[in-house]
Amino acid sequence: MALVVKDDVKISEFINLSAAEKFLPAVMTSVKTVRISKVDKVIAMENDSLSDVNLLKGVKLVKDGYVCLAGLVVSGEWNLPDNCRGGVSVCLVDKRMQRDDEATLGSYRTSAAKKRFAFKLIPNYSITTADAERKVWQVLVNIRGVAMEKGFCPLSLEFVSVCIVHKSNIKLGLREKITSVSEGGPVELTEAVVDEFIESVPMADRLRKFRNQSKKGSNKYVGKRNDNKGLNKEGKLFDKVRIGQNSESSDAESSSF
């Protein structure tokens, strides 16, 4: 018996397109393509498993662009007799994220007595085409209380996604507001809701710290004389120039963005 999503996947359940995005040519809008992926399947053979899942199967991506995982429909079927005990937890995972709570995009729990089930998730975030090609999503399956011999398959899952493929994120910049401008310094843009510890540190300071750390220990001197003097092309003496942390800090302070 093949697994199917009972109802057609409706784009309107996940995406609200404007009139311009619906009717104007793709080159005139920020939305390049709205697509529904082909079905990808995960066969759960073990009680605990973490498997790669291709949520963009059959989706044509844009080179150097982005893809937004707008929505996801998951359907499952227990390959068991009726009225079996036990259940399962299914969790979608972004394997790029190192913190466990940030890597989990959504979860669903159901009992084995419910032979067929389906649920929707709305991740609604974008990744680059380069990341998407590396198949960054996984599914964590945790089966409990099902008494079946090892090597057999108690559960099958299928995944279909609704995604937006686009070339540029420039439209998102229209939501930004200027929150602070210091005389002689760079203009910094930020969203309205930002963690305080992030907002309190100017980007220039972070850049300076990063560059200093990456260049630490790379001090060099120009010239071969031992009296802190060097010769230019005309044979005149000049002071040696030290290239290191001090000169880089000065450059960072005078840069404008």
Swiss-Prot record:
Pfam families: MP. One of its GO terms (cellular component) is host cytoskeleton. Residues 224-242 have a biased composition (Basic and acidic residues). It is found in: Host cytoplasm, Host cytoskeleton; Host cell junction, Host plasmodesma. Its main location: host cell. Keywords: Host cell junction, Host cytoplasm, Host cytoskeleton, RNA-binding, Transport, Viral movement protein. Residues 212-257 are annotated as: Disordered. One of its GO terms (molecular function) is RNA binding. Residues 247-257 have a biased composition (Low complexity). One of its GO terms (biological process) is transport of virus in host, cell to cell. InterPro entries: TMV_movement, Viral_movement. Transports viral genome to neighboring plant cells directly through plasmosdesmata, without any budding. The movement protein allows efficient cell to cell propagation, by bypassing the host cell wall barrier. Forms a ribonucleoprotein complex with viral RNA. Binds microtubules and modulates microtubule stability. Can bind double-stranded DNA. Belongs to the tobamovirus movement protein family. This is Movement protein. It comes from Pepper mild mottle virus (strain Spain).
